[in-house]
């Protein structure tokens, strides 16, 4: 594959996530009915984001915790020139201590444990077991896109980085699927088919399979993304991303359909956005969305630095 194509998709992955996250904030936590009420003509631009108590905490065009935490991982890869699990955990904790805006409850509970930075995976396991092994939130899959941009050991690294906060096998499987999809797109110009994704899912948890099934054969609406009780479930987010991967005809079409579905829209659009960015390349992300990001130039510098590791 041409280096230019790899670079296009590499940049597309990170910008695709950040744009999806920033645009998804517009409908985060809304029901489909509320989305239709606040955005009767859809949404085309960050300037249209309604300013209620939740959304006004961010400036328009800013991304949220999803991309903040993904950048903690990226910064660690660049600083250490390798995967250093404890360094990533330290950066997560530092981000949390410096405000950590938008942090999920589960992630906060794990990182609030006293010895988190010295044994993060143990902390994640403790909190998971305390919750009777029921919690499978989307706080790890939301940041895993960058792991797919590593040259090798993608599955193993996705597992280990996921377990820094989320120990449940549904979370781990979600991260491995997303990272593997991105890696195959960027470095091999290859789309994983239904059987391959099912094969990865079955290695981690059988409960992933019905969600893969659903989005492969049905539309996005079958996921009920705005379901109040389960909108933060890792398998709903994975499902939305897989729907975009297999069915969306462009970055813009896929992202807008997910954003206008409401629910945990910033996370759903962040993960789907990373995959669509990897599939179509940065040039196919609308220019006004890329340039409209509050920290577009900072993001560009960070990605260039990470990409330079491969030269």
Could you tell me what each predicted segment is?
Residues 1-311:
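Structured, active/binding-site neighborhoods that engage oxygen-rich ligands
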